[in-house]
Amino acid sequence: MTREFIYLPTFESKWKKLGLTDDDAIRLENELLSNPLIGKIIEGTGGIRKMRFAIKGKGKSGSTRVIYIDFQVHKEIFFLDVYQKSDKEDLSQHEKSQLKKLVEFLEEQL
């Protein structure tokens, strides 16, 4: 299975602020290559998924959440958001609405 991974600038910024590295990004990409549908679909977002991503030494339950969309037809995964579970559990309705608009925009561009 192949995918192109696209990191939005806001994602990259948050990724670095969380102390995650390029090696962590490679681990994330490998997880998604083995199963792009690993994340649970977030209702009302146009197909966006949320997955747990373990930070070494913390385990999955206390680590980060990665928000992404997999455009299967185009074989592209866009990384949209990342945050620690301790910072917030779920996306707000406003965030979901904004991400849905982003997905619609990305679909038009592909």
Predicted regions span which residues?
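Basic/aromatic recognition patch in beta-strand/loop cores that engages polyanionic ligands
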Residues: 39-82, 87
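Arg/Lys-rich, positively charged N-terminal/basic patches that mediate binding to nucleic acids
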Residues: 1-24
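Enriched for short, Lys/Arg-rich terminal
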Residues: 70-110
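Sequence/structural signature of beta-propeller domains
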Residues: 1, 22, 26-27, 34, ...
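N-terminal targeting/export leaders
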Residues: 5-8, 25-33, 39-45
